[in-house]
């Protein structure tokens, strides 16, 4: 016999802490706008275990997309990202690696000639908001980088494998990230109308490759 009790809607959902975000203070004036590969390499030089952890990830550092007349340029090859004292660096790590990741505090990283000093980190649990946004989801090999419909079908398949019921999915603009082996093509994705468990699962497991590059 199989018997599943209904959920108690009055019981508050507790966000699990088996995977968390570590949000670091940083001291850095500027970075190359396209810093994905060099930043990832610098982090992994100190935290080599990241490649062994399926649920670990490195978030890219972002300034404002727009503001004061400045728009993030499409050609990032010679552009700089100017950072403020409020800028932060975020790593996604499993719980058993939190202490290991704290050893990054106090280090100075060289990101293509730009110095980044890593400060203290705070643990941040995942969001339960029904709308989640990913800036960069890698377009898999075999899909045309301009084929939005094929990419959407790929994303839906990946999400369903995670047990996520896709209700509203919006595909955004494409973006190429420089890599020594050739550009990595990505697209942004927004999911809406997620329930809390789906929102957390999506952040825990994610979709796409190159999570150590943002």
Report residues per predicted region.
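RNA-interacting cores
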Residues: 1-214
């Amino acid at each position: 016999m199989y018997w599943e009790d209904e959920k108690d809607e009055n019981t508050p959902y507790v966000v699990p802490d088996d995977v968390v975000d570590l949000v670091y203070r940083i001291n850095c004036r500027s970075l190359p706008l396209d810093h994905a590969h060099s930043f990832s390499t610098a982090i992994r030089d100190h935290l080599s275990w990241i490649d062994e952890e399926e649920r670990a990830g490195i978030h890219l550092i972002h300034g404002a997309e727009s503001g004061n007349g400045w728009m993030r340029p499409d050609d990032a090859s010679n552009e700089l990202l100017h950072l403020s004292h409020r800028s932060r660096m975020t790593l996604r790590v499993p719980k058993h690696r939190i202490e290991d990741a704290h050893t990054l505090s106090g280090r100075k990283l060289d990101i293509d000639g730009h110095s980044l000093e890593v400060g203290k980190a705070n643990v941040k649990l995942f969001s339960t908001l029904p709308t989640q946004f990913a800036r960069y989801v890698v377009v898999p090999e075999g899909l045309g980088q301009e084929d939005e419909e094929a990419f959407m079908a790929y994303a839906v398949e990946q999400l369903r494998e995670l047990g996520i019921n896709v209700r509203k999915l919006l595909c955004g603009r494409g973006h190429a990230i420089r890599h020594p082996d050739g550009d990595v093509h990505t697209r942004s994705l927004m999911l809406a109308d997620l329930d809390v468990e789906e929102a957390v699962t999506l952040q825990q497991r994610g979709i796409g490759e190159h999570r150590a590059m943002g």
